[in-house]
């Protein structure tokens, strides 16, 4: 499962240039490029881990869409960061990972909500928790069998250059973080998200937190030691992938 490592490497190489001030950042909260990249890495891991998903994708029985605006059978609408489902219309563009096409989805079989907490960890706790919680609620209210997954990237860097706090081109404003305490509190807070063990239950079908060290100026690294989730934890990335794969096989094979 390589998405966490790939995402950290992607952030290291990514450049978001402030057109007004000239500063260059790895991450900008008002851009969705990081969410798109993370969802693509997750999708690649799912295709590699699930022979069933891969087989159905190669047969065009499944397609995917990123930033998918979908209306569920009950009339509720939601923009899904990543959606995989049955096709209504298959795009003529090239396939992703030489496996799965994009297009217009008829029925969503799997969705993933992607969140990022790079700074202001304490202030972000209620908002991120509520947004994640509402995502699985909307998906399951629309289709009890659909797999609802969530993933959050939490920053453990002790300093962070926030694009929204920069006022001039002469001097960077650098925010200070009390680490690893800030990251640990966010990780523990998100462990309160429910994870269901059957389609009658309430909660995500799979959830993961990954931790990165990103000051938003230099290289970004994946943080794998505590307080990051460890193997066996219910919010570890490998378990997240295995839970999605198992649920897909049980419900949609």
Model-based region annotation:
Residues 58-105:
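Active-site metal-binding core of divalent-cation-utilizing nuclease and nuclease-like domains
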Residues 107-108, 144-148:
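Short glycine-/polar-rich loops that comprise or flank the Walker A/P-loop
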Residues 7, 103-111:
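Short coil-to-beta-strand
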Residues 125-142, 193:
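Short, charged, amphipathic alpha-helix that recurs within catalytic cores of restriction-modification
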Residues 1-60, 64-70, 145, 156-253:
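C-terminal tail/extension regions appended to the core domain(s) of diverse proteins
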Residues 115-127:
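Surface-exposed cleft-lining segments at the edges of enzyme active sites
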Residues 82, 108-116, 132:
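Conserved catalytic cores of phosphodiester-cleaving nucleases, focusing on short active-site segments
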């Amino acid at each position: 499962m390589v998405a966490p490592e790939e995402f950290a490497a992607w952030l290291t190489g990514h450049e978001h240039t402030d057109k007004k001030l000239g500063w260059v950042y790895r991450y900008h909260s008002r851009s969705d490029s990081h969410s798109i990249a993370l969802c693509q890495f997750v999708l690649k891991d799912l295709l590699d881990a699930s022979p069933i998903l891969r087989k159905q994708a190669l047969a065009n029985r499944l397609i995917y869409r990123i930033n998918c605006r979908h209306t569920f059978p009950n009339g509720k609408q939601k923009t899904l960061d990543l959606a995989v489902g049955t096709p209504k219309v298959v795009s003529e563009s090239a396939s992703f990972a030489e496996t799965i096409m994009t297009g217009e989805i008829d029925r969503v079989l799997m969705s993933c909500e992607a969140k990022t907490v790079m700074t202001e960890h304490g202030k972000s706790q209620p908002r991120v928790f509520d947004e994640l919680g509402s995502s699985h609620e909307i998906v399951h209210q629309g289709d009890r069998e659909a797999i609802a997954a969530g993933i959050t990237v939490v920053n453990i860097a002790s300093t962070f250059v926030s694009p929204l706090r920069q006022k001039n081109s002469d001097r960077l404003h650098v925010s200070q973080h009390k680490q690893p305490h800030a990251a640990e509190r966010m990780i523990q807070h998100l462990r309160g998200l429910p994870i269901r063990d059957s389609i009658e239950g309430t909660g995500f079908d799979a959830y993961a937190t990954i931790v990165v060290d990103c000051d938003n100026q230099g290289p970004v690294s994946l943080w794998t030691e505590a307080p990051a989730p460890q193997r066996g934890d219910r919010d570890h990335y490998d378990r997240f992938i295995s839970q999605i794969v198992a649920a897909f096989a049980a419900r949609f094979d």
